[in-house]
Swiss-Prot record:
This is Adenylate kinase. It comes from Anaeromyxobacter dehalogenans (strain 2CP-C). ATP binds at G10, A11, G12, K13, G14, T15, R127, V136, Y137, G199. Consists of three domains, a large central CORE domain and two small peripheral domains, NMPbind and LID, which undergo movements during catalysis. The LID domain closes over the site of phosphoryl transfer upon ATP binding. Assembling and dissambling the active center during each catalytic cycle provides an effective means to prevent ATP hydrolysis. Some bacteria have evolved a zinc-coordinating structure that stabilizes the LID domain. The gene is adk. One of its GO terms (biological process) is AMP salvage.
Length: 214
C-alpha cells in the first residue's frame, strides 16, 4: 500500500505516519528525514541541500524529486510506504505519478487530515521548547511541572518565532494556497480521502484505519 499524507502544520501528520508505519509494517518516508540522511551521508544531494539552506533558500523540486527517486529504489519500500511532506505541489505529484508508473506501481490513497485553523493556531502557538536540551512542551496539553521552565535542566522555555500566532496564520495561508490545488488533483483522480484530524492520536489512527478498510 502506498499512502500520501496531507494536512496543515500542526495536524499531526508525522504522528499518524509513525503509527501507521508500525500498524502496516511499511516505512514512513518524510522529506525532513531524507534531507538529514543525505547530509549525514555527505552525498552530492546532501551538499546541495546544505548549501541552499545555509543561504536561506528553498530546496528545488529537482533536488527533492531526486531524493525521492533514490529513496524509492531501496528494497524496504517493496510492500508499500507512507509519504509525509511530499508531494507539496501538483508538479511534484505529477513527477511522483510518473516515477511510480515507471516502477509498475500506483498510489493507494492520499489522506488529508482536516483541522480548523484556530485549532492549529492553538496547537502550535502553545508549544514551548528548551533552548538547552531541546525538550518540547505545550502550555495546556503537555505543560512542564513548573510553568515556563524545563523539567530536565530548569532552563527558561522559549517560543519559536515560527510558532507565534501571527506566523502560524501566515503558514496556514501559504499551506492553503499550495495544497488546495494538490487536494483537487487527487480528488479529481478519486484518490483523496479526508480524515477528521481532531482527537487523540489513537482515535485519529482508528479513523484512518477505517477509511483504509483495516
Amino acid at each position: 500500500m502506498i499512502l500520501i499524507l496531507l494536512g496543515p502544520p500542526g495536524a499531526g501528520k508525522g504522528t499518524q505516519a509513525k503509527l501507521l508505519s508500525t500498524e502496516l509494517g511499511i516505512p514512513h518516508i518524510s522529506t525532513g528525514d531524507m534531507f538529514r540522511d543525505h547530509k549525514a551521508r555527505g552525498t552530492e544531494i546532501g551538499k546541495q541541500v546544505q548549501a541552499i539552506m545555509d543561504g536561506g533558500g528553498l530546496v528545488t523540486d529537482d533536488i527533492t524529486n531526486a531524493m525521492v527517486k533514490e529513496r524509492l529504489s531501496r528494497p524496504d519500500v517493496a510492500p508499500g510506504f507512507i509519504l509525509d511532506g511530499y508531494p507539496r505541489t501538483v508538479v511534484q505529484a505529477e513527477y511522483l505519478d510518473g516515477l511510480l508508473r515507471s516502477l509498475g506501481r500506483s498510489i493507494g490513497r492520499a489522506l488529508s487530515y482536516e483541522v480548523a485553523e484556530e485549532l492549529v493556531v492553538e496547537r502550535i502557538s502553545g508549544r514551548r521548547s528548551c533552548p538547552r536540551c531541546g525538550a518540547v512542551y505545550h502550555v495546556s496539553q503537555n505543560p512542564p511541572r513548573r510553568a515556563g521552565y524545563c523539567d530536565r535542566d530548569d532552563a527558561e522555555l522559549v517560543q519559536r518565532e515560527d510558532d507565534k500566532p501571527e506566523n502560524v496564520r501566515k503558514r496556514m495561508q501559504e499551506y492553503g494556497t499550495k495544497t488546495e490545488p494538490l487536494k483537487r488533483y487527487y480528488r479529481d483522480r478519486g484518490e483523496l480521502t479526508e480524515v477528521e484530524g481532531v482527537g487523540t492520536p489513537e482515535g485519529i489512527l482508528a479513523a484512518t484505519k477505517k477509511v483504509l478498510g483495516r
